[in-house]
Amino acid sequence: MITTRFAPSPTGFLHVGGVRTALFSWLYAKNNNGKFILRIEDTDLERSTQEAVDAILDGMSWLGLKNDGEIYYQTKRFDRYKEVIQELIADGKAYYCSCSKERLEELREYQQANNLKTGYDGKCRDANYVPQQGESYVVRFKNPQDGVVSWDDAVKGRISISNHELDDMIIQRADGSPTYNFCVVVDDIDMAITHIIRGDDHVNNTPKQINIYKALNANVPVFAHVPMILGPDGAKLSKRHGAVNVMQYREDGYLPQAILNYLVRLGWSHGDQEIFSIEEMIKAFNLEHINASPSRFDFEKLKWLNKHYIKESKFDDIQTEVEYHFAKTGLDISNGPDLKELVAVMAEKVDTLVELAEKSSYFYSDDISYDENAVKKHIKASTGEIFVKLLENFEALDAQQWQDPDVLHNIVSTTAEQCQVGMGKVGMPLRVAITGSGQSPDIGITLKLLGKNKVVARLTKALEELCK
């Protein structure tokens, strides 16, 4: 069975690069009716935090990238790692090393001063050293000293590294804890991982890991090293570009559908298709069409996709996110139009759900403030008479008539005729009075969504406060 994994380290938040790696791994598993494993690589005890673990799990849940089976934590598998280390020592494939930090530092300085390759010189490799109680030691892996490590990377093609370039890496630290490059191999073997899709910053780890696979007589999985994501300026993506906790994108009003759709196209293509549902992603995804070159993050493209999903999604598919953002504003959504109807009207005017909530606040809150520029531009000496006539005409409408935007639009038009002014001389002051600004959807739709009581109350208030 095809089995992939996403294995983040909880030393920081889940950012877009990690999300893309998780997405590619998840899609490949789903495309092949396989399994997708989530593993938290928390062996760095000093830097790993529960806050970061929670952020990773929250991000994966929000995006809908559900793992199969349990979530694995490396810190809960230390006994297993120590067991395998002892097997390697017993088989002569690993050894105890007593070299002090001072000796290793002197060795490094000597190598650098003489333009030699830096790395461990193998002093303890064949010394058959057995540590006595109280002695400090590490365990090193016996890397082959000749030959070449090669693999056919699913993204980068054939890669070969001479074993002469690799030293005997530490697989168990002096404090007894196992190291990253060793743990991941044991995990991937035990979890039957067949395909490892990860960032190309791991390419240099791969030959070391392949040698451990071979030492343990295990099958070497397929590796697919995905290029990094660059900022719009071509520099490495950083916080200033937006390499923030993926949950910040939620706070900024982006839909998970938009994030996933954007990231799947960031370094992977399927013809000219830009818009993908999750089902379409799963059906189309493969490793062959992952681009070997880095991609640049384009915020305008992400914003465009987000707008598309706000406009085109079934309301049921985005309702949770819409309600989340309205709740953040403190607006009482029971004091206004149905959110489904509101989104249909406002979607064309916003790029994010934050904008949606902000630009729609006047539908739900009676505490509106008037935009000074709009008041100055549209409220004139004659506006009071227009508001009086509008109130008279609106009061004459029954509940059924108020549900028809065309009827309401015609009332505004009729009022303009009665007052012998152009439509704009009525519509724009009316907008300011009922929304606080000169911008809103079509006036008939705006009146309908606000409802008769709100419109009459706000017109009355504007008549008193703006038309003195």
From Swiss-Prot:
InterPro entries, per the entry: aa-tRNA-synth_I_cd-bd, aa-tRNA-synth_I_codon-bd_sub2, aa-tRNA-synth_I_CS, aa_tRNA-synth_I_cd-bd_sf, Glu-tRNA-ligase_bac/mito, Glu/Gln-tRNA-synth, Glu/Gln-tRNA-synth_Ib_cat-dom, GluQ/Sye
Q: Which GO terms describe its molecular function?
A: ATP binding; glutamate-tRNA ligase activity; tRNA binding; zinc ion binding
What are its E.C. numbers? 6.1.1.17
Bound cofactor: record note: Binds 1 zinc ion per subunit.
Known catalysed reaction(s)?
Answer: tRNA(Glu) + L-glutamate + ATP = L-glutamyl-tRNA(Glu) + AMP + diphosphate
The reply on keyword Protein biosynthesis is yes
Keyword Protein biosynthesis carried by entry: yes
Q: Which residues form a coiled coil?
A: none
Binding of ATP, residues: K239
Q: Residue ranges for motif 'KMSKS' region?
A: 236-240
Name the positions where Zn(2+) binds. C97, C99, C124, D126
Q: Which SUPFAM superfamilies match?
A: An anticodon-binding domain of class I aminoacyl-tRNA synthetases (SSF48163), Nucleotidylyl transferase (SSF52374)
CDD domains named in the record: GluRS_core (cd00808)
Going by the entry's taxonomy, the superkingdom of the source organism is recorded as Bacteria
- Report quaternary structure and partners: Monomer.
Q: Which family does it belong to?
A: Belongs to the class-I aminoacyl-tRNA synthetase family. Glutamate--tRNA ligase type 1 subfamily.
Matching PANTHER family: GLUTAMATE--TRNA LIGASE, GLUTAMATE--TRNA LIGASE, MITOCHONDRIAL-RELATED
The protein in question is named Glutamate--tRNA ligase
List the top taxonomic levels of the source.
Bacteria, Pseudomonadati, Pseudomonadota, Gammaproteobacteria, Thiotrichales
